[in-house]
């Protein structure tokens, strides 16, 4: 049995969805819960609501899929990052964003009681759009 949480985070309209054996059970956007239009942070309330609605314990989640891969297309991103973040006024922001994505497993284990053995999958952002059309 597989239980998968899909997370759209750090991007406009953050949300979460939960699947059991490839069947969508529940999905919700964070803005429906925190009342902040087009929320672009981490959808913690959405994840909790997915688990609550389906009555699934967070320790039973086998996989988490993130809507972005912080290391994809790095060769194209580096010139942009250098110009905007390294030499601009947002120097620390880019490193914080990448760090948040990479450390997602620690956050889920420490704050939402996920099992340490949960598998984290980083999916390229555009591939995530393509995959969503399947459902």
For each predicted feature, which ranges?
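Short acidic/glycine-rich loops and adjacent helix/strand connectors
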Residues: 1-135
């Amino acid at each position: 049995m597989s239980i998968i949480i899909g997370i759209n985070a750090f991007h406009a309209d953050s949300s979460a969805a939960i699947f059991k054996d490839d069947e969508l059970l529940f999905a919700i956007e964070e803005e429906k819960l925190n009342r902040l239009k087009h929320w672009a942070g981490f959808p913690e309330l959405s994840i909790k609501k997915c688990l609550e609605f389906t009555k699934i314990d967070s320790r039973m989640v086998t996989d988490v899929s993130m809507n972005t891969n912080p290391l994809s297309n790095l060769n194209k991103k580096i010139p942009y990052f250098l110009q905007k973040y390294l030499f601009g006024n947002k120097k620390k922001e880019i490193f914080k964003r990448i760090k948040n994505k990479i450390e997602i497993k620690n956050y889920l284990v420490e704050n939402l009681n996920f099992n340490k053995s949960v598998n984290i999958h980083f999916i390229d952002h555009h591939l995530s759009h393509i995959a969503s059309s399947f459902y």
